[in-house]
Amino acid sequence: MVQVLSVLVIPLLTLFFGYVASSSIDLSVDTSEYNRPLIHFTPEKGWMNDPNGLFYDKTAKLWHLYFQYNPNATAWGQPLYWGHATSNDLVHWDEHEIAIGPEHDNEGIFSGSIVVDHNNTSGFFNSSIDPNQRIVAIYTNNIPDLQTQDIAFSLDGGYTFTKYENNPVIDVSSNQFRDPKVFWHERFKSMDHGCSEIARVKIQIFGSANLKNWVLNSNFSSGYYGNQYGMSRLIEVPIENSDKSKWVMFLAINPGSPLGGSINQYFVGDFDGFQFVPDDSQTRFVDIGKDFYAFQTFSEVEHGVLGLAWASNWQYADQVPTNPWRSSTSLARNYTLRYVIQMLKLTANIDKSVLPDSINVVDKLKKKNVKLTNKKPIKTNFKGSTGLFDFNITFKVLNLNVSPGKTHFDILINSQELNSSVDSIKIGFDSSQSLFYIDRHIPNVEFPRKQFFTDKLAAYLEPLDYDQDLRVFSLYGIVDKNIIELYFNDGTVAMTNTFFMGEGKYPHDIQIVTDTEEPLFELESVIIRELNK
């Protein structure tokens, strides 16, 4: 007889969180705020942090997103709930009523995941429930001085949940033991589960035959420890241009990022259903921007790996100038493994499945083979502005001797003119160092001067290709009101950052400029699009 198991991955932490008293929940709110993103999910009101329980309903053809949610304030606080939203295309989201809530105001339903129990191993379902909609949530129940792993099941496809009467299903007598991720291991016909044991900085991997009774199989610990581990994820990722795959362990740290605050790291290796063994001890980051944390993947995805993250940073998330909501998610990304300089590296890209035909192209600028000089910049001349743009640029670096300090070009994201001023952020490339960078400092705007809001970040990249002896690079970017996602060299490196222009201002046009008098950069292809939801 084949033993059916669930695999659970849990990190084992030390943080103090504030308390906010309960009040009535009112989701009716004006959503016309000038800097609210259009296609990055934001709650209508209140506070959001980690995405939870991502899954795809194959029967309803619907994506489900749950998230850490405080509807009573725009800062973290208990009682904490699982908020809920759905989408049929990953960019147009409908927010629903709270999915799971705590029993008392000084408690919280902390992060977790959802598994579709097709085979009814839990015994929660009968034949009237579609196998694709047998939804079981496993989450951390945060009560005073204790964190346990509890489960709840849904009989209506994930909109409402009933808590298991014999909770908790895992209790290790710790107040820093959370963020369970459950997944079905097809090869071993098993469910696996992991959690973070924060205080001891390790990931614990459990197995179960019924989602109710769990056995500890192994521990994992590596990489940047930071102050705590959290939000661990273990998933099989395909290798590009092959029929092979490798297992990848994702885990988050906070604080402890080299950039400050929170970040996600990953490890490539093998998993036998019980233990994860990395290929090496090297630390790699999922996204090198300042605002990409608590990464989650969708379960029940038919092809490939699709995931998103919380687009903020614990260093300043509760201070950003948005109202009546705080925080957004990143866009969903497709993940693969690619050999880069003979080493497997995680790559991320947004493709047509994430930016579907339902996104309206309002206007477009398209150019080819432009030799960029200080007398020949590129500028959009779009008639209106939605604050939502994307751009795709492939360029090569010409072999010229240029003056020191004149080895770069910049992409300026400019606001509309308001009160006789224009706010800008810039992305650029320095050919002398093979370095992409972003500068999100905006003079005369208060928030970007916050102590921990690192305004300048950079990334060294090897060329994507060579044209004879000339280096070739590519950059795709998407700008959505107050967030920019950058994908360098076909997704070899991703960088996500929020930015905040002055009151009433948001992105209006894009310029590509350089200081060089002679052409150092040939822009082989430039496509800039103004988009609308």
Swiss-Prot record:
A biological-process GO annotation: sucrose catabolic process
GO molecular function: sucrose alpha-glucosidase activity
Reaction equation(s) it catalyzes: Hydrolysis of terminal non-reducing beta-D-fructofuranoside residues in beta-D-fructofuranosides
Gene Ontology cellular component list: extracellular region; fungal-type vacuole
Residues annotated as catalytic: 50
SUPFAM superfamilies named among the record's database cross-references: Arabinanase/levansucrase/invertase (SSF75005), Concanavalin A-like lectins/glucanases (SSF49899)
Signal peptide start and end residues: 1-22
Keyword set includes Glycoprotein: yes
Keyword set, alphabetical order: Glycoprotein, Glycosidase, Hydrolase, Signal
Enzyme Commission number(s) from the entry: 3.2.1.26
Residues annotated as binding substrate: 47-50, 68, 110-111, 178-179, 314
Enzyme class at the top of the EC tree: hydrolase
Source superkingdom: Eukaryota
Listed InterPro entries: ConA-like_dom_sf, Glyco_hydro_32, Glyco_hydro_32_AS, Glyco_hydro_32_C, Glyco_hydro_32_N, Glyco_hydro_beta-prop_sf
UniProt xrefs under SMART domains: Glyco_32
Protein family: Belongs to the glycosyl hydrolase 32 family.
Protein name: Invertase
